[in-house]
């Protein structure tokens, strides 16, 4: 077995890993990046996450004008494959052509804090690295229940790659991933049922927001949400698979299990490197994302919020220690905007009304129904509402929840205002173009 020495070893071709590799090489450093699968060059987002799922949401909306939903679905899947293949190749070629970067396709495991064994198709080699960065991501959690081996039971990756449109889809789990897939498949004409084990729908959201989401789901494709539905087992039959729950039985041609994600750490043999895990199984790091004196973890595997843009910010934190002043930490990102790409999108930043009430701070709630926005009427998208929490003493925005068209774009404007302490009054009087969703901020912050 050959042994090689390198200043930097990156395990995982995700957003943080690939960006760090390119940056280090452009500063004259030598880097080896190891990726387990050629099908994952570029990471989760472009291959089995953000990009293909959003494409299918868009294609689903387009299919509303078509009568042959099955053909539209198959065409959408072909476009998904074309797009992800192109992005995967572009990501590989962009990195592989940078002098100083070498990409190995294989599995990596630690032998010691500085030595990693990499097994490729050509055999095994040992890599001794001064600094090692782990960016292996996460994968969908599974259910170890009777009948779960049925091939019609999918995780999110599998449901993005179906060959044919199911007439019925049952989704186990009522979280944000479930909502996106519900909207996606309902748009293509699939009958969708969401099974939520808890007794509260979208427990982290304000009740008026959750109720607005329920109303939208019911209106758009008749998505059904069942609460307190604990999944017990699956029953396989030739024509369908049945999900047996505490609230009854639900048959479908496809079942999605969307109950969270688990870190990809098992194959790494982290104990050999002295790397510790959190109680939830993610890599334990400090505020600089350092797991040991010479090992860093970035992205989902580090327990960071599971968004591509957070993985990118993780890169910035680690990069600052290697190439910068070393001052940037996870504590610097106080405000994190989020978006759920339902139809319309649900986006949030800062405090919700529920959190504001628990904080003890003086506040008022600004509220505007989406139906009051002229551009929403033009688009025919009048579901939802906009909410903002404003400090009554300072006039500063404490948080916002937007459930309306273009919410995923508009939330970034509100985050920017909050970051720079721009008062709500400035948005109330700001001149916006018309007709736009952004101009609704005038009315939102003028509301009582």
Regions inferred by a protein language model and the residue ranges of each:
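Flexible, glycine-rich terminal cap/loop adjacent to redox cofactors
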Residues: 9-39, 44, 51, 55-56, ...
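Glycine-rich dinucleotide-binding loop and its adjacent helix/turn
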Residues: 50, 136-191, 195, 225, ...
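Beta1-alpha1 glycine-rich phosphate/pyrophosphate-binding loop at the start
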Residues: 6-8, 13-87, 184-204, 409
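A Rossmann-like FAD-binding core segment of flavoenzymes
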Residues: 102-105, 109-120, 189-287, 351, ...
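Rossmann-like dinucleotide-binding cores of NAD(P)H-dependent redox enzymes
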Residues: 42, 82-89, 160-161, 166-170, ...
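N-terminal Rossmann-like dinucleotide/flavin-binding domain of flavoprotein oxidoreductases
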Residues: 2-6, 44-129, 205-232, 353-355, ...
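Core beta-strand elements of the Rossmann-like FAD/NAD(P) dinucleotide-binding domain
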Residues: 4-6, 122-131, 246-254, 291-292
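FAD-site-proximal beta/loop scaffold in flavoenzymes
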Residues: 150-166, 249-325
């Amino acid at each position: 077995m050959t042994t090689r020495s390198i200043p930097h070893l990156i395990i995982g071709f995700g957003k943080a890993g690939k960006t760090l590799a390119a940056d280090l090489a452009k500063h004259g450093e030598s880097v080896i990046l190891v990726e387990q699968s050629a099908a994952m060059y570029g990471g989760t987002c472009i291959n089995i996450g953000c990009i293909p799922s959003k494409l299918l949401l868009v294609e689903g909306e387009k299919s509303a004008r078509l009568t042959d939903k099955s053909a539209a679905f198959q065409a959408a899947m072909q476009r998904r494959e074309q797009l992800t293949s192109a992005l995967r190749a572009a990501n590989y070629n962009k990195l592989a052509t940078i002098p100083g970067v070498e990409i190995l396709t294989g599995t990596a495991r630690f032998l010691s804090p500085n030595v990693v064994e990499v097994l490729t198709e050509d055999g095994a080699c040992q890599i001794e690295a001064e600094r090692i960065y782990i960016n292996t991501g996460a994968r969908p959690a599974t259910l170890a229940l009777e009948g779960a081996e049925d091939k019609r039971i999918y995780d999110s990756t599998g449901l993005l790659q179906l060959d044919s449109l199911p007439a019925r889809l049952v989704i186990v789990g009522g979280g944000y991933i479930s909502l996106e897939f519900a909207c996606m498949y309902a748009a293509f004409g699939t009958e969708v049922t969401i099974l939520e084990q808890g007794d509260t729908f979208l427990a982290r959201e304000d009740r008026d927001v959750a109720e607005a989401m329920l109303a939208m789901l019911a209106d758009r494709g008749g998505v059904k949400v069942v609460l307190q539905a604990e999944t017990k087992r699956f029953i396989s039959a030739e024509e369908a698979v049945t999900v047996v729950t505490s609230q009854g039985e639900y048959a479908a041609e496809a079942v999605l299990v969307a109950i969270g994600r688990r870190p990809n750490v098992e194959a790494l043999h982290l104990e050999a490197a002295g790397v510790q895990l959190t109680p939830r199984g993610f890599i334990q790091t400090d505020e600089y994302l350092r797991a040991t004196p010479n090992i860093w973890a970035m992205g989902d595997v580090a327990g960071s919020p599971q968004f591509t843009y957070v993985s990118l910010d993780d890169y910035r934190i680690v990069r600052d220690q290697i190439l910068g002043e070393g001052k940037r930490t996870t504590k610097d990102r106080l405000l994190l905007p989020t978006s759920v790409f339902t139809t319309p999108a649900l986006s949030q930043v800062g405090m919700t009304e529920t959190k504001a009430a628990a904080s003890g701070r003086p506040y008022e709630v600004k509220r505007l129904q989406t139906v009051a926005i002229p551009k929403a009427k033009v688009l025919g998208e009048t579901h939802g509402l906009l909410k903002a929490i404003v400090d009554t003493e300072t006039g500063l925005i404490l948080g916002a929840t937007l459930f309306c068209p273009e919410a995923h774009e508009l939330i970034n404007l509100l985050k920017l205002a909050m970051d720079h302490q721009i008062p709500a009054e400035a948005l109330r009087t700001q001149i916006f173009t018309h007709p736009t969703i952004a101009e609704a901020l005038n009315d939102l912050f003028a509301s009582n």
